[in-house]
Structures are given as structure tokens and as C-alpha cells.
Design a protein with these regions (language model features):
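ATP-dependent adenylate-handling active sites, centered on carboxylate activation for C-N bond formation
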Residues: 8-12, 114-117, 127, 181-433
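Cysteine-centered catalytic environments shared across enzyme families
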Residues: 1-279
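Short, hydrophobic secondary-structure boundary micro-motifs
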Residues: 32-33, 267, 418, 437-439
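Short clusters of hydrophobic/aromatic residues that line enzyme substrate/ligand-binding pockets
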Residues: 55-57, 100, 340-343, 394, ...
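Short linear loop/turn motifs
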Residues: 271, 438-444
């Protein structure tokens, strides 16, 4: 993961280390600072693919900073993915991020046209915060740099949003979605979803320079990721925390890992180890309050801090081991619960923040987007993944949040959606004869 800070608010050089503390952890390879047209552009680089390329990108008085990974850029024309962004803006205009395939947060200043573009991908997998006060802009990967600069009112850019403003007057010119989904439920097989998922794993793992790791439970989501990586003959390492897992399923998956030649660590997360993992969070992760709620009840978890989530401690533990083992690319299963099951099945909630008990209606327009598509547990657990993995200098990638994977699920008929818990993944695991525990929701 990379990170950035942009502002035209003045600060002292000796304040920079405090301002950049949490964000610098995400990009430990190179920190670059440039002053352009009265603005400070700071970028922290985590180099994962392509040549080591510092930012910002500049061309014809247009300046761009970027955090994430693009999977469809012209590798013959550009030595890194971010170098393609200004050319795409010049070709397609302020809504150019609609043409991107990847996970990203982008800020682009066109000083010629007085235009500022802020955009994340459809699910805001990479965070982006901004503030506009007294004629000054503050834009950053995290909230804390803006607060350290003295900004009082900081806003997280909404998921699936392109925000176009005037640089000088701060006037909002336009907001548009990055991805628009078709809610017609017309496909009566899982074939196209399976193909999209296979392609999503491939684009996030093939031809990478750094090593890959996953957290492997006995559940559906990590099982599907593991299965596809094994099918692709990918080199990767799996870390499993035993305890609440289905040990029979986990043992079978461990056997498949062994015969593939990939490493699989079975771990006991003892209280002393939990304390160490939690202390890392306290020291290196900024505060983030969860936004989890249900649209069908008054249940919420607004009181819960990312720092106190048990899953945060588990991810911190696994991330510490991945960093020790020099594995930098984390393939996350985030999003499957929110999109393919709504934390329930057949109208019965598995967790109280479920919105409709996983019973998909004949007309998706009546519920889409339900809160956990873009907000609620999606926003909260993505923050957990990004903040924790980022604090160890690791990059998280999200195959279940690929727009094609999501669209193919939405296109399946209600009968297919409701045929089994997490129907698309259930079918995938069955077709591949991969060990699974039917209808179990497993994880930290």
C-alpha cells in the first residue's frame, strides 16, 4: 500500500514526521515531497509491481497522486501503472476513473482548468479523506494527517464516488459513480461468476514481484481463494489461527497445501501473542469508529473501535508473521459476506447487522444498495484490512470486490442466489471438490 498527503496549508519542516507518521507506515520504501503551485504533494511508496516509480506524476501543469493497483494498464507504454493516469484524464476527462480496473484512491489537480478530481474505486478499498477550510485544501489517505495540519472537519470520500471540484473556489462541480451496476437477474448458471472470480484471482496474483499470503480459515471465502491459487499453481503462504475453526476441514486444506509445495502455518493465538498484536495496533494504527448497522432493525456497532475488534488483533498477528517472512501481498476475502450472503441465509440472520437475512428478492431495486454494499460492515472491515495491513507495510487486494465478480453475482437469478448460503462460492467449492463445511460462517 502507498499513501499520500496534499495541502496548501503551511506547516513547519519539523512537523512533517508527526503529520506523516501513520501514512508513512503504508509506504516504507520511498517518501517523496514536492512543492507545486503552492501545494505540498507528499507520497509514501510501497513498490510492488513494475519499476520503482516515485510520485507525484506531472504533465502539462497536471499533478496526480495515487495509491493502489491497476490491472489493465499498457505495460509496454508505461513502466508503472500510475504513469497512465494523467493520459487517461486527458483522453476521458474528469470521470476517467470509470475506465480503470483496479483498487485505488486518486487525487488529480489540473491547474490549467482549475479542476480537482478525487476518486476511489467502487468500494473505496483504498481510503481517501479530504477537508476544505478557509480557502485551503487538505487531502490524505488517513484522517490524522489532516487533523495534525489543523483541519477541523474531515470527510471520508464515499465509496463509488468521483468528486470534481474547483481548486480555487472549492465549488463542487460534479459527483458521479465509478461503477453503475445492472440489477437485472437473468443468468441461471454460476458459470460466468466462476469465470469472473478465476480472472479476478489471476489478475491480482500473476506476474507479481513480491510474495503472496492469505489468512486461511475453514470457511468459504478464504477457501475459495486458496483453491484458485492452488489451481493456478501460484506460490503463496497460508496462515491459519486454530481454535474456533472446523479442524477437520482445516486439516484437509493443510494436506492440499502440503502436496502443492506451499507453506501453511497452523498457529495458536495465545494471550501473550494477542497482547503484542494489540500493542502494535495501539502504537501504529489511527482510530476508526465502525459504522456497522442493520436496515431492518435498530442494531448498530457505532460504539466499536477498529482497535478493539478481535479480528483486528488476529490480522495484526498474521501480518506480523507475513512481514517477518517477507510476504507483502495479502489476498483478502473481504466483501463476500456483505455481497453474497448479507450475513444470513434464507431470511435467517447469522449476525444481527444482517439487513435482510440473506434472502434475495425478485427485484433487487427494492434493496440495492443495502447498507453493507458500500457502508456499514463493508466500510468498517475494509478499514480494518487497510489500516492493519498498511501499518505493517503490506498491500491488500480484494478479489471478491472486483466489479465483474460483483456484477456477475447480481445477474444471477434469485433462485440461484438463494439456493445455498453464499451460493456462488458454495457452488465453486463443490465444483472443485475443495474441503468445506456447509453453511458455516467461520473467521476471527
Amino acid at each position: 500500500m502507498c499513501s499520500f498527503i496534499v495541502t496548501n496549508r503551511k506547516f513547519k519542516d519539523e512537523e512533517l514526521s508527526k503529520i506523516n507518521y501513520f501514512t508513512q507506515l503504508r509506504g516504507p520504501d520511498v517518501t517523496s515531497v514536492e512543492n507545486i503551485n503552492g501545494y505540498t504533494f507528499l507520497h509514501n511508496l510501497l513498490s510492488i509491481t513494475g519499476e520503482l516509480t516515485t510520485q507525484p506524476f506531472e504533465k502539462d501543469n497536471i499533478v496526480c497522486l495515487y495509491n493502489g493497483e491497476l490491472y489493465d494498464y499498457d505495460q509496454e507504454k508505461y513502466k508503472s501503472d500510475g504513469e497512465s493516469l494523467i493520459d487517461l484524464y486527458l483522453e476521458y476527462g474528469p470521470l476517467f476513473t470509470q475506465k480503470l480496473d483496479g483498487e485505488f484512491a486518486i487525487v488529480l489537480f489540473d491547474f490549467n482548468k482549475d479542476i480537482l478530481v478525487l476518486s476511489t474505486d467502487a468500494f473505496s478499498t483504498k481510503p481517501l479523506w479530504f477537508s476544505e477550510e478557509k480557502g485551503e485544501w487538505g487531502i490524505a489517505t488517513y484522517r490524522t494527517p489532516l487533523e495534525s495540519l489543523g483541519f477541523k472537519h474531515c470527510t471520508k470520500l464515499k465509496a463509488n464516488t468521483i468528486r470534481v471540484s474547483k481548486i480555487s473556489s472549492h465549488i463542487l462541480v460534479q459527483e458521479a459513480p465509478v461503477v453503475t451496476y445492472d440489477l437485472t437477474q437473468h443468468k441461471d448458471t454460476f458459470d460466468d461468476w466462476t469465470k469472473a472470480f478465476e480472472e479476478s484471482i489471476a489478475k491480482r496474483t500473476q506476474g507479481v514481484r513480491e510474495d503472496i499470503f492469505i489468512g486461511l480459515s475453514s470457511g468459504y471465502d478464504s477457501g475459495a481463494i486458496c483453491c484458485q491459487l492452488l489451481k493456478n499453481n501460484s506460490k503463496f503462504k497460508a496462515y491459519s489461527v486454530v481454535g474456533s475453526e472446523n479442524i477437520d476441514v482445516l486439516s484437509q486444506r493443510n494436506y492440499l497445501m502440503q502436496i502443492s509445495g506451499n507453506d501453511h502455518d497452523l498457529l495458536n493465538f495465545t494471550q501473550p501473542l494477542r497482547n503484542i498484536a494489540h500493542q502494535h495496533i495501539e502504537n501504529n494504527v489511527e482510530e476508526f469508529k465502525y459504522t456497522i448497522r442493520s436496515m431492518s432493525s435498530d442494531y448498530n456497532e457505532y460504539w466499536l473501535s477498529l482497535k478493539d475488534d478481535n479480528g483486528s488483533n488476529g490480522l495484526s498477528f498474521i501480518s506480523s508473521l507475513a512481514k517477518r517472512d517477507t510476504n507483502k501481498i495479502y489476498i483478502s476475502g473481504q466483501g463476500a459476506d456483505e455481497l453474497f450472503a448479507d450475513y444470513g441465509f434464507n431470511g435467517k440472520k447469522k449476525y444481527p447487522h444482517s439487513n435482510f437475512g440473506g434472502l434475495f428478492p425478485d427485484d433487487l431495486n427494492t434493496i440495492f444498495p443495502w447498507p453493507s454494499v458500500y457502508e456499514s460492515s463493508m466500510e468498517s472491515y475494509l478499514a480494518k484490512e487497510e489500516h492493519i495491513a498498511g501499518s505493517y507495510g503490506l498491500e491488500a487486494r480484494y478479489p471478491f470486490l472486483d466489479p465483474k465478480v460483483v456484477q456477475e453475482f447480481l445477474w444471477t437469478t434469485p433462485e440461484l442466489k438463494n439456493s445455498n448460503y453464499k451460493s456462488v462460492i458454495h457452488n465453486y467449492l463443490q465444483e472443485n471438490n475443495f474441503p468445506m463445511a456447509v453453511n458455516e460462517k467461520i473467521g476471527f
